[in-house]
């Protein structure tokens, strides 16, 4: 199985990584193009474009200015240890074994507005550039047009290398929109997580994000290879619901 997840806004570049093993992102020339565009933006432009405070806009203007593609452990960190936030809290990479971390490198891919498609051990420098940002660039009016078919092709290549034909989409809609499902060369599965609130089951963003991270970890640590094995996911009180599921959207429920 190849797993797709979103990145996180929250970053941790303070804690040292748990391994000295790393790789370099595949699309750094693309990243450089975007950085050049972003460097032309004033902090006030960034604040408007990204809908962030002046303080965060200033921080990211500085990050764009400092960014350079010669990554090492001195100025960058592996993506899986740099990203924090709900999905990554659920995934809890810090407690994986060396073998499990190595397994993530072939099975997990992180979609990114700046870096395109990241392997877990790819080095990244601090940034904020969400996939849904309407950043005008030489290839179009937003990042979806900038990346075009590039990320879909990269997912297909990663799927072929993984030896599987199942793609488990645990990314948000904003990020998965950068992928063209009809061009994927595998079976696409997009799990849904619902929590019971006031007697009704519904997707609650905070819980769903954590559940996506937990499922990604479950696939890695349990060596899940089939849809039947995926349906056995039962962490944090979730259970598979045949009634609420469809062939492409296995649905997991959790009671109040």
Curated annotation (Swiss-Prot):
It comes from the Bacteria. It holds the Pfam family H2O2_YaaD. Coiled coil: none annotated. One of its GO terms (biological process) is response to hydroperoxide. One of its GO terms (cellular component) is cytosol. NCBIfam families: PRK02101.1-1, PRK02101.1-3. Belongs to the UPF0246 family. This is UPF0246 protein Sbal_1048. The lineage of its organism: Bacteria, Pseudomonadati, Pseudomonadota, Gammaproteobacteria, Alteromonadales.
């Amino acid at each position: 199985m190849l797993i797709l997840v979103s990145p996180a806004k929250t970053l941790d570049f303070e804690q040292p990584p748990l391994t000295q093993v790393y790789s370099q992102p595949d699309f750094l020339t693309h990243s450089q193009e975007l950085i050049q565009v972003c460097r032309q933006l004033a902090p006030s432009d960034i604040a408007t474009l990204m809908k962030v405070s002046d303080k965060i806009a200033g921080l990211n203007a500085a990050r764009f200015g400092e960014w350079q593609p010669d990554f090492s452990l001195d100025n960058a960190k592996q993506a899986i240890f740099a990203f924090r936030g709900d999905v990554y809290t659920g995934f809890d990479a810090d407690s994986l074994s060396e073998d499990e971390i190595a397994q993530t490198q072939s099975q997990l891919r992180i979609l990114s507005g700046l870096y395109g498609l990241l392997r877990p051990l790819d080095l990244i420098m601090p940034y904020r550039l969400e996939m849904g940002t309407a950043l005008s660039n030489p290839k179009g009016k937003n990042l979806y047009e900038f990346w075009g078919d590039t990320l879909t092709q990269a997912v297909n290549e990663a799927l072929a290398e993984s030896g599987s034909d199942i793609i488990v989409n645990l990314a948000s809609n904003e990020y998965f929109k950068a992928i063209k499902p009809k061009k994927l060369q595998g079976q696409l599965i997009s799990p849904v997580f619902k929590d019971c609130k006031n007697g009704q089951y519904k997707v609650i963003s905070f819980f769903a994000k954590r559940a996506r991270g937990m499922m990604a970890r479950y696939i890695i640590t349990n060596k899940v290879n089939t849809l039947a094995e995926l349906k056995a996911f039962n962490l944090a009180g979730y259970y598979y619901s045949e009634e609420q599921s469809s062939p492409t959207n296995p649905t997991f429920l959790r009671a109040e």
